[in-house]
Every structure is written in C-alpha cells, then in structure tokens.
A protein has these predicted regions:
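Active-site-proximal region of nucleotide-activated glycan assembly enzymes
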Residues: 1-48, 54-58
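A short, well-ordered alpha-helix in the C-terminal region of glycosyltransferases
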Residues: 214-228
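Donor-nucleotide binding loops and adjacent catalytic segments primarily
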Residues: 45-52, 56-144, 177-180, 185, ...
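Well-ordered beta-strand positions
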Residues: 10-11, 27, 136, 143, ...
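A donor-sugar binding/catalytic signature common to diverse glycosyltransferases
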Residues: 134-176
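Conserved acidic donor-binding segment of nucleotide-sugar-dependent glycosyltransferases
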Residues: 190-196, 208-212
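C-terminal alpha-helical cap of glycosyltransferases
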Residues: 227-242
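Short, hydrophobic alpha-helical segments
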Residues: 83, 205, 209-213, 238-242
Length: 242
C-alpha cells in the first residue's frame, strides 16, 4: 500500500534513512514517528521512580523485556525457557517482563510452579500483563529487550536506551529488521535474529549488562537518532500542502 501511494502523494514522512529504496527521493522528508511526550532522555530521578514503582532491587542491574504492542509469544517462550533453566547468568540482576494480557493466565500458572521449585525466582523476575508507565520501565532498565516496531524504536531512541532488538519475522517485507538495522549500523543498538533468539536473547542482554561502557555508547548513539518533534514536523508538512 505504501509503495502504491508513494507515487501519488506530494510528501512522504519517514523515520529512517535509506527510504529512497522504496519511495521517490524528492518526496521524502525525515520527520520521525510521533510518540508521546513522556518519552524523554531518562534521568536518575526517573530511574529511581521506575525501580520503586515496579518493585525492583535498586542494588541490582535491571533488564526490561517487552514484546511490542501485541506482545510476542516467541519472546514469552524464550523467557519461560530461561526461567525453567534457573535463570542462568542472573546473579545481581532483576528482570521486568511484560508478558501480555492474552498470555497472563498461563504464565501465572507457570511462575507459580517455577517459584515452588525455586523460591528465589520471585526476587529475580517481576512480570505483568501490562506496563502502564513505559517511560518509567525504560528508565528503570539498564538494558531493554524489545521487538523493533516503528513506535518502539522511536520511543527507545527518545529515551536514550541501550536495547537488544529481536525483530519479528511476521511483518511485511521484514521491516522490523530494517528498523533495527538503522540503529545497529550507527552503533545505537544490538540485534539478535528471531531464529537465534531462543539461545541468544538472554545471554546477549546479560553480557551487555556487564559492559557499562558499551551501554553508555549505545545510549549516546540512540539519543543522536531521536527525532522528538515528529508530530510537529509532520503537521508542518501538511500545512505546506493545504
């Protein structure tokens, strides 16, 4: 649909470089994706608030696992496998996991069974079907694991977060991989292919967690790619046409 419309419209607002592959170059304007104003560079105050709100241990490092707006069953499967194996590599780490409303009942049962076998699990993994304050969850996290839909990528750049992207393969023209690679090429994110994620997702995030200089570099470079005024820029382009 986008390609068909691209030949008929006067202006095409995009969020990433390289869109000349899909649209006429003279129509492209780099605006970014509109996101809520709460997504700003994370501060220490925001981090402390997020850690408190989500019941995390302030003495630990934190990973936030989020599967996108519809929540990824694959990411949930990976989390269940990692937890059932005893959360390897999680010493000194808290994990906040958004599991999604659709999956919550099954995960409640799974977590009850796993906690009965390993009572320390409740001190390592916090999970919820829905995260109301994504800005604070991002702020609490030292590393985020996420799908790479357009809105998620824009939010994470605006928040200046270090992220391991797991692009969904179940999207048109593999656009989530293109979204993630736009950051990876600028050393602003890391990527694990969906096909490799079962074995590599958590080890990659946990390894990154032990590299504060790498995290700082990813955060800085992600921030450079943020386009926080996207809504205004798009509105300006619309006004030019009317």
């Amino acid at each position: 649909t986008n390609k068909k419309l691209g030949g008929k419209v006067q202006c095409i607002c995009v969020a990433y470089e390289g869109m000349e592959r899909f649209f006429p170059a003279d129509k492209i304007v780099m605006t970014g994706n509109p996101i809520r104003s709460v997504f700003v560079p994370c501060t220490q105050e925001m981090k402390e608030e997020g850690v408190k709100d989500y019941g995390l241990d302030p003495a630990k490092k934190h990973i936030f696992v989020v599967g996108g707006s519809l929540v990824s069953s694959k990411i949930n499967q990976i989390m269940r496998k990692w937890i059932s194996e005893g959360c390897p590599g999680s010493e000194g780490v808290d994990v906040l996991w958004q599991c999604g409303k659709y999956y919550k009942a099954g995960i409640d049962q799974f977590m009850a069974e796993e906690t009965a076998k390993n009572p320390a699990l409740k001190d390592t993994v916090r999970y919820s079907d829905f995260i109301g304050r994504m800005d604070l969850a991002y702020a609490a996290a030292d590393v985020v694991i996420s799908r790479s839909g357009a809105s998620s990528v824009s939010e994470l750049c605006a928040a200046h977060k270090a992220v391991v992207f797991i692009p969904s393969p179940n999207v048109a023209e593999d656009h989530q991989t293109h979204n993630a690679m736009a950051l990876v090429r600028k050393d602003a994110a890391m990527i694990v292919k969906d096909a490799d994620a079962m074995e590599k997702m958590m080890p990659t995030a946990l390894e990154l967690l032990r590299k504060p200089e790498k995290i700082a570099s990813l955060e800085e470079n992600a921030g450079k790619m943020a386009l926080p005024d996207a809504a205004r820029k798009i509105a300006d382009e619309i006004y030019k046409l009317v």
